[in-house]
Amino acid sequence: KAFAFTGKESYRSNFMLPATIRDNAPYTIEAWILNPEIAENECVADFTSSHDELEKLMLVNGTEPRCGVMNHYGWYEDAGYKEMKTLEGKWQHVYVCFDGRIESIYINDKLISQKDIQLLVKPSQFMLLGKNAEEAWPFSGYLHSLKLWDEYIPYKRQTK
């Protein structure tokens, strides 16, 4: 079972990002996503309403090699996956963990990015599912689960 997105809908929270996720604070994101046809930029979840550089925590499911998985409105800090198109029509277990210095991103047990980054996350007015805060980058696919923690939780390989 999963939430289905057609690219037309989005769901906006009536609560803010926790105050514990500010500046360069640790966080962990986990999601199960299925996308039948992956476009260049599809936003699964935008956790920040900010539009400024390095103030963004946006989980993306797109083919853009620079920022198709995680977007921080940076350049170096963003992360994509050149082989994303091969995951069309398959369930993806996406896991992002940031300890305040190193951000590691895994898809289906494979480490696809690991970088030393600096973020400047500001207080956020809301979180949005299905599009980014600018109401762009519509997501068309399925979201089975989405979790966000305000702590660094190291990745552990999935057991089948």
Segments the model singles out, each with a brief description of its role:
Residues 6-69, 102-103, 134-138, 148-159:
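Extracellular glycan-recognition modules
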Residues 16-19, 80-86, 116-118:
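Beta-strand-rich interaction surfaces with strong enrichment in secreted/lumenal proteins
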Residues 68-93:
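Short, aromatic/His-centered strand-loop micro-motif at the edge of beta-sheets
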Residues 90-104:
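Localized edge beta-strand/strand-to-loop motifs within extracellular or lumenal beta-rich domains
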Residues 115-143:
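Flexible glycan-contacting loops in extracellular carbohydrate-active proteins
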